[in-house]
Amino acid sequence: MTGVRCELRCKHCGGHYLRGMQSVETPSKLKEFCSRLEEEGGTGVLVSGGSDVHGRVRLDRFYDALRWVKENTGLIVNVHTGLLDAGQAEELASTGIDVASVDVVGSDETIRRVYGLKATAEDYGETLNALREARVPHVVPHICVGLDFGEIRGEAAALEMVQRFNPEVVVLLGLIPTPGTPMEVVEPPSAEDMARAVAAARLMCPEAGVAIGCMHPRAGKRRMEELAVKAGADRIVLPSRSTVERAKGLGFTVRHLDGCCAIPRSLEHRALRDD
């Protein structure tokens, strides 16, 4: 929704990943894109953008367009929110969206060092609570392992916060050393780091789906996936073929979804692929 613009310019991203997104900088462009997406057989849409200096994705101009998309298409609508207060959460819920995806950070120090925000970890908990109280149908927390320059700091606290809300899905990401950012040469989280995060999420949120999301290092991908499956992950974005075969060998029933890792279980049937 913001093109390549981001006021926050976090140290792990610097707006880099906005360049790979479809730009819909006006409400009319969002409606046109979603209409075309459905005509082409799309399942859903992730609506995101750069953040302002307060860590918010400025959604207010798009509320009516989001409402139109829900009323006029069959797309699953997932919105990446950033920080929200109760009023903003209620406005967003009134549009009828299906999913709110929220990045959750458990360390105040990491928030300051990486995001440059004066916010606290509890502000992310308040965002989760505001969305729940506003009755957004599905609130999906995302936790980035190694966000603080590759160090493991605050991930356990983030999971403890998330646990309070009984999420249907928890998405785990891994820091990617991104060219052109202050973190381009840091050591990313290891396969073991990712697996430990998966195991913690599985133990703390036993009823939730635990997903390895799309943003994670590609180095050591197969080993990370193997350990993640053994640790309790039940969703992996674009898994390697060997991981799929290994999961089958461990007794898992493997299903393929054409959609985002944050799709809640109750909507999975709309994204199932016939193989």
Task: Mark where each language-model region is.
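Short Fe-S-cluster ligation motifs
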Residues: 32-51
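Canonical Radical SAM [4Fe-4S] cluster-binding loop centered on the CxxxCxxC motif
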Residues: 1-28
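Disulfide-bonded cysteines in secreted/extracellular proteins and peptides
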Residues: 6, 10-13, 34, 214, ...
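Auxiliary Fe-S-binding modules of radical SAM enzymes
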Residues: 31, 156, 160-275
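Conserved, mostly hydrophobic/aromatic
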Residues: 10, 47, 102, 201, ...
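Conserved functional loop/turn residues at catalytic and ligand-binding sites
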Residues: 5, 14, 41, 96, ...
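Conserved AdoMet/S-adenosylmethionine-binding subsite of the radical SAM
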Residues: 54-208
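Glycine-rich anion/phosphate-binding loops
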Residues: 18-32, 84, 153-157
